[in-house]
Regions:
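Extended substrate/RNA-proximal surfaces in nucleic-acid metabolism proteins
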Residues: 1-92
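Charged catalytic cores and adjacent phosphate/nucleic-acid-binding surfaces used
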Residues: 17, 70-174
Length: 174
């Protein structure tokens, strides 16, 4: 990654080691809590790797577990300790957390991660937050960004982050 001229590098996790993308899993045959425990443990390992700029769509599996399948799953308190450890490492390593708006236009109906995690990140000293629409179609480019910026303000942020040459640039939320 260091040999290429990227503006920023996202870290994301779509599947657990040795498994398919969360999109393809049969949640009727899975222990959801075990999957989520493994997911957050693997995210923690990725954050320890430190070769990225922004952690993308934390809570990605909830798009399918809660959004598509309607299976209730708790972030706090069930996975709060490891989530806090992830957020703490992001703060310590001056990394951004992405507020991904794709869940707003899907059955989930909320951002990834949800607003309470964004607030927690801010409370822990989080400074850098990127915002992305996770567009896989041209019509979704920028979808939900205005709502996302409003959520950032509510969480205590007055700026969001873009990257130029892998260096963070803070822009005011207007």
């Amino acid at each position: 990654l260091t040999t290429c001229g990227f503006d920023f590098v996202l870290a994301s996790l779509h599947n657990l080691a040795g498994m398919e993308d969360f999109y393809f899993l049969d949640y009727d045959r899975q222990d959801v809590n075990e999957l989520l425990t493994r997911y957050f443990d693997e995210i923690l390992e990725m954050v320890r790797w430190d070769g990225f700029d922004s952690l993308a769509h934390l809570t990605y599996p909830y798009r399918y577990i809660t959004g598509d399948k309607g299976i209730p799953a708790q972030l706090y308190p069930d996975h709060g300790e490891v989530i806090d450890e992830i957020l703490s490492l992001l703060v310590q390593n001056h990394k951004a957390l992405e507020l991904n708006t794709s869940g707003l236009r899907q059955k989930l109906g909320q951002t990834l991660p949800p607003p309470d995690v964004i607030r927690r990140f801010r409370q822990m000293g989080g400074k850098y937050v990127t915002i992305g629409s996770d567009a896989h179609r041209w019509g979704d480019i920028g979808a939900g960004v205005e709502t996302g910026l409003s959520l950032l303000l509510q969480a205590g942020f007055d700026r969001f982050t873009i990257y130029v040459g892998r260096e963070p640039v803070l822009l005011p939320i207007e």
